[in-house]
Amino acid sequence: MGALTKAEIAERLYEELGLNKREAKELVELFFEEIRQALEQNEQVKLSGFGNFDLRDKRQRPGRNPKTGEEIPITARRVVTFRPGQKLKARVEAYAGTKS
């Protein structure tokens, strides 16, 4: 299974909307930059019909070096999470079925 890339999204904008290739690439970059900036400013990103990007703080926790077995602390950090919306979930389940 392949992955959809930013270049492929730009190519689809070029084909579907008639933007020139430079404009399509800039539009894709601008879209993702807006999401990045919002998250950097601790804002939630809500894309109606798609899902939400949130920031979540994870506490420090114990970890283990798999090679040596030595216990090492995993430092506290902030992570980005994505929660798909109901419409996205429904479409994915309709096409892919539910997999366990």
Swiss-Prot record:
Pfam families: Bac_DNA_binding
GO MF, one example: DNA binding
Entry's Gene Ontology BP terms: DNA recombination; positive regulation of metabolic process; regulation of DNA-templated transcription; regulation of translation
A GO CC term attached to the entry: cytosol
Transcription recorded as keyword: yes
Region (Disordered): 53-73
Subunit-level organization: Heterodimer of an alpha and a beta chain.
Role: This protein is one of the two subunits of integration host factor, a specific DNA-binding protein that functions in genetic recombination as well as in transcriptional and translational control.
Official protein name in the record: Integration host factor subunit alpha
Annotated source species: Pseudomonas aeruginosa (strain LESB58)
Gene: ihfA
